[in-house]
A protein has these predicted regions:
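Acidic, low-complexity, intrinsically disordered interaction modules
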Residues: 16-57
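Negatively charged, low-complexity tracts enriched in Asp/Glu with abundant Ser/Thr
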Residues: 1-17
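Non-transmembrane, interaction-prone segments in cytosolic or luminal domains
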Residues: 6, 12, 27, 52-53, ...
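Mixed-charge, Lys/Arg-enriched low-complexity segments
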Residues: 44-77
């Protein structure tokens, strides 16, 4: 697991690919939880909730980087 991507998610940074409309972020309600789950959105639809480790692996596979969500902006909380 990429520690950098995990820390970015834990700090509220949204990982995005605006061209493909794919986003992964940690909602504010998950901050400080023992097993944080991230939200994956694709094409404006919520595609699922992922444990942090799976979210990081998906972000690496999709080549997501810090970006701007169309509704949330730059940060998820």
């Amino acid at each position: 697991m990429s520690k950098i991507l995990a820390e970015q998610l834990l700090n509220g940074i949204i990982l995005a690919d605006n061209d493909n409309r794919e986003y992964i972020y940690l909602p504010g309600g998950e901050v400080g939880s023992e097993d944080p789950h991230c939200i994956f959105e694709k094409n404006g639809e919520r595609a699922g909730d992922l444990p942090l480790e799976e979210a990081v692996e998906l972000a690496k596979r999709l080549h997501l980087s810090p970006g701007r969500h169309p509704e949330l902006g730059n940060r998820s909380y």
